Amino acid sequence: MLILALDTSGKMASCALLQDGVVLDLLQQDSQMDHSRLMLPLCEQLLQKHGLTFADVDVYAAVVGPGSFTGVRIGTAAVKGFSWAQDKPCAGVSSLQAMACGSTENGVLCCSLKARPVESFYALFQREDGFLIRLTEDKVGKDEEMEAAAERHGATVFLRDCQNAAGAAKAAWMQARSGKLQNCHEILPAYLRLSQAERLRKERMEQQ
């Protein structure tokens, strides 16, 4: 099974190819959040490097959040388009799970992304002998809440802002093996919190 995975949830745009559980290659570029312009050429470059086309891909995967709202929308829309055009299944992957899958360390992993100055997106996982188990759902909260959760679960490995498409491809492979792939209509962004515009609108409505 050949998986093409995209990650546009942060400043780095990346794409990766995975064949039967093994990452073949990873391309990434600091796009300064210009993912809409760079993502398609980056995918084409990766496929051409290995003598492949979009038609050769069996599963398309995207990091669907949490992370940059705009970036998440771009990656999700791209994979929806690839999946629809090629009539292939797809996988929506958590950025935090991608981070965990990209690590090889055993123990309890606390994976986090900066959300706001004093808030983080976070989730905890446990890996033993190559098996990854999710301990918590993806959450957003104050850094103190994340630290308390990490202490409660006995976290020994701390990963922050280091997700990429290679980890996303591994997470998609896990979904494929467990029969949890999606179609192009089912994959959706997972923001976890309101955008700034939505937050301001909500505050204005509450003040009226």
Model regions: which residues?
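Short, well-ordered amphipathic alpha-helical segments that serve as non-catalytic structural scaffolds
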Residues: H35-H50, L96
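Oxyanion-binding and handling regions
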Residues: M1-V22, D34, A91-Q208
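DPxDG-like acidic metal-binding loop motif
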Residues: V59-P89
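Phosphate-handling active-site elements
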Residues: Q48-A55, S83-V93
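Short amphipathic alpha-helical face segments that pack within enzyme cores
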Residues: L38-P41, A77, G81, A98, ...
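Phosphate/pyrophosphate-binding loops at sites that engage ATP/ADP/AMP, CoA/4′-phosphopantetheine
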Residues: C43-D58, R127-D129, A150-A155
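Surface loop/turn motifs at the tips and blade-to-blade linkers of beta-strand repeat domains
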Residues: Q29-D30
